[in-house]
Design a protein with these regions (language model features):
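Helix-coil boundary and N-terminal low-complexity module in membrane systems
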Residues: 54-56
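Structured interaction patches on ligand/partner-binding surfaces of diverse proteins
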Residues: 61-110
Length: 130
């Protein structure tokens, strides 16, 4: 996809913005960088240690496909107990959010859709304090 969408809680579009709480209609777009499978966006993270998820389809559409965390490094501190959730940093501030899907993904048709990596490399999620 050309963009993926982050939603969850304990973040906002700006420091003075309304804290988000799992509202797909106000999801943060992470835009694809060139021809890579890296997606980036910037948001403000509060210190409440929230969780997020990434939607791979239109966040307000009828079918919402979330990125499973099973294809990320199992030792990563960003993984959450929920199979599609990731933990936010606990230091408050603006962050660049970067998701690297390595060789890309394939999303199957049908209910439920299955997300499959196009290669064997583990995906990465990075938070860079700005």
């Amino acid at each position: 996809p050309d963009a993926i969408y982050m939603y969850g809680w304990s973040w906002a579009h700006s420091a003075s913005g309304t804290a988000q709480s799992w509202q797909p209609e106000s999801a943060l777009p992470l835009v694809r960088v060139g021809d890579s499978f890296v997606y980036e966006g910037t948001c403000y993270v509060f210190s409440w240690a929230g969780d997020i998820a990434f939607i791979l389809t239109n966040p307000t559409g009828n079918t919402k496909v979330e990125l499973p965390n099973e294809n990320f490094d199992a030792n990563s501190s960003v993984l959450s107990g929920n199979p599609t959730h990731f933990s936010l940093p606990t230091t408050e501030g603006y962050y660049k959010i970067s998701v690297d899907l390595k060789e890309g993904i394939t999303i199957s048709e049908g209910e439920p859709s299955i997300v499959t990596p196009n290669g064997s490399s583990k995906f990465t999620l990075r938070y860079t304090l700005q």
